[in-house]
């Protein structure tokens, strides 16, 4: 959510900034609603004051034994008019809130201006793209040939966009989770956190998934209003909702492994085969809570921490700065890490690292006390995948395949697999 004061005082500036995203904000309509709000608030307060004065006068007249019926009728008329104006004011406030909750974040000045992913800017590359002397296979072809990845069985159990993994591939998948957690905890200093995988609407509103992106979520039946979490960013970031932190507590740096559940409502026909885009997948998430002045340095660190995982696994990747037309709604600035997939002959997203600035904190009322001014200020929140586990498995399978369809294990993962160094076709 954007700053209400900024919206009220300079809606045209907001409209200009959001237009960089391709988002149309009707500043004129918003300003008209604001004028109505201010007029109704002044009028309502005036009526309230007048009714209070007349009610007091009735009490004084009654104590003197005077006839108060004419005065009571006037107060009742004022009361009816006051209730009508309160109803009108409530409706205006609801309209303003609906607009405010629909607005995306203002992009940081360093974000490249562009329309879509074609306008994203490559920042750096790491690693050499492998050259194969044989026709490469996709991860799903490799996994099915190994007899350890079964999409048909998953479709039978549930439906499309699910997978069943068995044997060494399932073990490799689990090893990746432990490897990522160990690196982030032991070397990067994150605190591990375990959170619910089911969240309520308040949590989703706080991090920005609601109300705009409900179609992307799995909502549970029943009266609780619960949803399956689409990313552990949601429950982890909400651990500071409605809190006033001390400056000494910042930065907070959490790492969390969780399953994620997404309906992929807008991805019909995209990545229909394999594990690239699934309804259920695992992710190791990094979340930072910082002071405002520290958040952009934190974004660079968070991104580098995610990069370390790819470097340890010796997977070629690149870092891309997303343009204004491609960053997520709540983000002020985002770097994507894209890993090389030989079967597609291209880089694919494996992590998205974002600075949300105060966008989520304002919704969550997540604050800290500034020791220099003693003022209560909003924190900044950041998040990034460190990494998406399934896509990391995909990248290993494709980059470490040989001509026989075997998968060689990266050196960094061998200690987690009890000496297994190759997953072989039998």
Curated annotation (Swiss-Prot):
Its main location: cytoplasm. Pfam families: Seryl_tRNA_N (PF02403), tRNA-synt_2b (PF00587). It catalyses: tRNA(Ser) + L-serine + ATP = L-seryl-tRNA(Ser) + AMP + diphosphate + H(+); tRNA(Sec) + L-serine + ATP = L-seryl-tRNA(Sec) + AMP + diphosphate + H(+). The keyword RNA-binding does not apply. L-serine binds at residues 231-233, 285, 385. The keyword Aminoacyl-tRNA synthetase applies. PANTHER family: SERINE--TRNA LIGASE (PTHR43697:SF1), SERYL-TRNA SYNTHETASE (PTHR43697). Consists of two distinct domains, a catalytic core and a N-terminal extension that is involved in tRNA binding. Homodimer. The tRNA molecule binds across the dimer. Catalyzes the attachment of serine to tRNA(Ser). Is also able to aminoacylate tRNA(Sec) with serine, to form the misacylated tRNA L-seryl-tRNA(Sec), which will be further converted into selenocysteinyl-tRNA(Sec). Belongs to the class-II aminoacyl-tRNA synthetase family. Type-1 seryl-tRNA synthetase subfamily. This is Serine--tRNA ligase.
